[in-house]
Design a protein with these regions (language model features):
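Helix-to-loop junctions at the C-terminal end of transmembrane segments
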Residues: 57-70, 154
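Symmetry-related core transmembrane helices of the 12-TM Major Facilitator Superfamily/SLC fold
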Residues: 160-176
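Residue-level signature of mid-helix packing/kink "hotspots" within the transmembrane helices
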Residues: 50-59, 143-144
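Helix-breaking motifs and short loop linkers at transmembrane-helix boundaries and internal kinks
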Residues: 69, 90-92, 96
Length: 220
């Protein structure tokens, strides 16, 4: 376990900081939407924008990783996430916020793909479970810490948005300075939804229902 952490500390440190920012901004936007008196339809639309970007990023980013590599993709989309949160502070209206949430979703799913593919490349059959369990533990702890930051901020002001941007930008530092080589990209293999359903109907339906529940809870 300690050897795994030693070999992946830069990756996990940057990801932990990023998850703090992620947890903070998700709750911040919900509270600020109430303060700005956005109607329920507008709030639902802007929070759903995250998952629109998430879906779009999941289908396009693997090709981009193949062209420019894991580290550049992580850096580029952490920067985009840092930029998109500032849109919320500058343009306080549902349309601008929806656009910003699409950018955020696209950026974060890109980072998730980089993380998970990088970890799977480093893992063996013996260590894969340990690596992925650490990854999920850091994800949840980071989001929890980010949520707590809401208690020490004033959501009606612009400073919390700047703090999120600072966290997202600082997440780049350990990744860009790591001595570890990024994984070599392998040829992509694709499976469509029909193929996935034929392979495992129950798992496909379960993932769909889990996604519905997760997106609803995350957007509250």
């Amino acid at each position: 376990m300690f050897k795994i952490l030693k070999n992946s500390w830069a990756l996990f440190t940057g990801y932990f900081v990023l998850m703090i920012a992620h947890g903070f901004q998700g709750n911040l936007l919900g509270v600020r939407s109430v303060i700005e008196e956005f109607n329920f339809m507008a709030t639902g639309a802007l929070m759903s924008g995250y998952f629109v970007g998430y879906f779009a990023g999941a289908s396009t980013v693997p090709k981009l990783i193949g062209k420019v590599g894991h580290i550049r993709v992580f850096a580029a989309f952490a920067s985009m996430a840092s930029l998109s949160i500032l849109i919320h502070a500058v343009f306080v209206n549902p349309i601008a916020w929806t656009f910003a949430r699409v950018l955020t979703g696209f950026s974060l799913v890109s980072i998730f793909i980089v993380m998970e593919s990088w970890l799977n490349d480093r893992a063996t059959n013996r260590t894969r479970g340990q690596l992925l369990s650490i990854y999920m533990f850091i994800t949840l702890i980071g989001v929890a810490f980010g949520t707590l930051l809401l208690n020490f901020s004033s959501p009606e002001k612009y400073e919390p948005f700047i703090l999120v941007s600072l966290l997202l930008s600082s997440a780049l530092i350990p990744i860009l300075l790591t001595k570890r080589k990024a994984p070599k990209f392998r040829k992509l293999g694709f499976i469509d939804i029909k193929g996935l359903y034929r392979t495992s109907p129950l798992a496909t339906l379960s993932m769909f229902c889990t996604g519905l529940i997760h997106s609803a809870l995350f957007s509250l």
